[in-house]
Swiss-Prot record:
Positions of glycan attachment: 9
Disulfide bonds: 12-176, 95-180
Residues reported in the UniProt entry to bind spermidine: 102-103
Pfam families: 7tm_1 (PF00001)
Organism: Rattus norvegicus (Rat)
UniProt cross-references to PANTHER family, sorted A to Z: HISTAMINE RECEPTOR-RELATED G-PROTEIN COUPLED RECEPTOR, TRACE AMINE-ASSOCIATED RECEPTOR 9
Protein name: Trace amine-associated receptor 9
Function: Olfactory receptor specific for trace amines, such as triethylamine, N-methylpiperidine, N,N-dimethylcyclohexylamine (DMCHA), beta-phenylethylamine (beta-PEA), cadaverine (CAD) and polyamines such as spermidine. Trace amine compounds are enriched in animal body fluids and act on trace amine-associated receptors (TAARs) to elicit both intraspecific and interspecific innate behaviors. Trace amine-binding causes a conformation change that triggers signaling via G(s)-class of G alpha proteins (GNAL or GNAS).
């Protein structure tokens, strides 16, 4: 039996993986961190550099990418070592910060997705007046509130140790030298569940409404297309089609987030009421499903957004350093804006 810290009383037990499984785990988990960092960096760079992408929705997407980027930089590399080795080698202080960063950035992602669902609902249901309702200023307020609430919640619980109130004996029993755990007591886990559940209900309801409206609009356009005078698509129809496409892509991003998060949240609630009975390997799988979500959004954008693929080519090829590259037209006529 190998310990995290030899010759130290109360040391955690180190994982007993043989070399090949250990190398595979490092490769798989490390790949997730690299995708989260460089994929989201591409999203941020594209939106901030190309003036055509300076829209309220895209600023929300850029801030969401920033949260996922920070997960890839400050959380995933350290969690990779902890998950593979079974040990925390980065000190008690950074253990607290790691937990705070983890929770802050993940909840920031959730709140951003909720704001994006509101933005898409307004855009699809009322595309012509949308630009006057959801402005860049409104987007900025949404971004500020998303970051404020997520950071305040996380640091007020985990940095102060409030998460351990009432379960001190259990925490002592679970604690060993070389570990980094942050169990939530029953009160805080319920708040955590509500912070996840309420935005989720809002998102599911709004995207449900979006797709109902989109279906009605599609039928209306099909009906008007059969009329002789409808030889060309009207401006309103083009705008509606563009907004539906954006809503569909961002709806997929929301669905991916919920699928990644839901098992972890359910397990966290069960654990708090069952004295943390979840086996370590199950917990690690659930945590990494959440982490890997930070790498998924750039892949979703690359698959569904032609403008993002074009932006990637310009960034990777270095053409963004050319004069006036920020004014490059990323959209084809038929694609419309993202």
């Amino acid at each position: 039996m190998e310990l995290c810290y030899e010759n130290v009383n109360g040391s955690c037990i180190k994982s007993s993986y043989s070399p090949w499984p250990r190398a595979i785990l490092y490769a798989v988990l490390g790949l997730g961190a690299l995708l989260a960092v460089f994929g989201n960096l591409l999203v941020i760079t594209a939106i901030l550099h190309f003036k055509q992408l300076h829209t309220p929705t895209n600023f929300l997407v850029a801030s969401l990418a920033c949260a996922d980027f920070l997960v890839g930089v400050t959380v995933m590399p350290f969690s990779t070592v902890r998950s593979v080795e079974g040990c925390w080698y980065f000190g008690d202080t950074y253990c607290k910060f790691h937990t705070c960063f983890d929770t802050s950035f993940c909840f920031a992602s959730l709140f951003h997705l909720c704001c994006i669902s509101i933005d898409r609902y307004v855009a699809v249901t009322d595309p012509l007046t949308y630009p006057t309702k959801f402005t860049i200023s409104v987007s900025g307020v949404c971004i500020a509130l998303s970051w404020f609430f997520s950071v305040t919640y996380s640091f007020s619980i985990f940095y102060t140790g409030a998460n351990e109130e009432g379960i001190e004996e259990l925490v002592v029993a679970l604690t060993c030298v070389g570990g980094c755990q942050a169990p939530l007591n029953q009160n805080w886990v319920l708040l955590c569940f509500l912070l996840f559940f309420l935005p989720t209900v809002v998102m599911v309801f709004l995207y449900g409404r979006i797709f109902l409206v989109a279906k009605q609009q599609a039928r209306k356009i099909e009906g008007s297309a059969n009329q002789p005078q409808a030889s060309s698509e009207s401006y309103k129809e083009r705008v509606a089609r563009r907004e539906r496409k954006a809503a569909k892509t961002l709806g997929i991003a929301m669905a991916a987030f919920l699928v990644s998060w839901l098992p972890y949240i359910i397990d966290a609630v069960i654990d708090a009421y069952m004295n943390f009975i979840t086996p370590a390997y199950v917990y690690e799988i659930l945590v990494w499903c959440v982490y890997y979500n930070s790498a998924m959004n750039p892949l979703i954008y690359a698959f569904f957004y032609p403008w993002f693929r074009k932006a990637i080519k310009l960034i990777v090829s270095g053409k963004v350093f050319r004069a006036d590259s920020s004014r490059t037209n990323l959209f084809s006529e038929e694609a419309g804006a993202g």
